Amino acid sequence: KCEDAADVRGAKVQLNGAGARYKAVFKVYAAGLYLPKKAGTTEEVLAMPGAKRVSVTMLREADSSELGKLFSRGMEDNMDKSSFSRLVPGVMRMSQIFSEHKKLNAGETFQIDWVPGTGTVVTVKGVPQGEPFKEPEFFNALLRIWLGPVPADWKLKEALLGKPAA
């Protein structure tokens, strides 16, 4: 269960939607999308100013380097080649962050926050990981993993956008 609201470096954000990521028949993680106000489309989410958060709680053990690779692939699948190539240094650093953790166990969390004026802050198990990613496009590219035209999980995309389960 995701909290109804969160604090992103002093900015209050509310739960827009939450759901589980399935791989085959297994729930892999639960994710929540937090925004300054409700949004029902990917375009609204990407265009919305202010702090934003994706919060993920693992529901089973996962290999962190595999998670990093899936993030990279999810970003690449949801943007054109030239946009992706500009973000490669950030993508490499993101993969590095996850591979340093070896694995994430059930119940462990990570957050990806957009902090206006600071950038994207990745927090794993409650600890901020290195310097913020400065480019706004990087956070939006991460969001597209879940909300883009080729989402990680269609049902999760609908849930994060606050749509009732079918």
Give the label of every model feature segment:
Residues 39-117:
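Mid-length scaffold segments of soluble, non-membrane domains
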Residues 155-166:
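Cysteine/selenocysteine-centered motifs that mediate thiol-based redox chemistry or coordinate metal-sulfur cofactors
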Residues 129-156:
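Flexible glycine-rich active-site/ligand-binding loops centered on an Asp-His dyad
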Residues 6, 121-123:
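Short aromatic-centered micro-motifs
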Residues 1-48:
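N-terminal secretory signal peptides
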Residues 73-80, 144-148, 161-162:
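Short, intrinsically disordered, mixed-charge
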Residues 124-128:
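Short strand-turn-strand beta-turns centered on an Asx-Gly dipeptide
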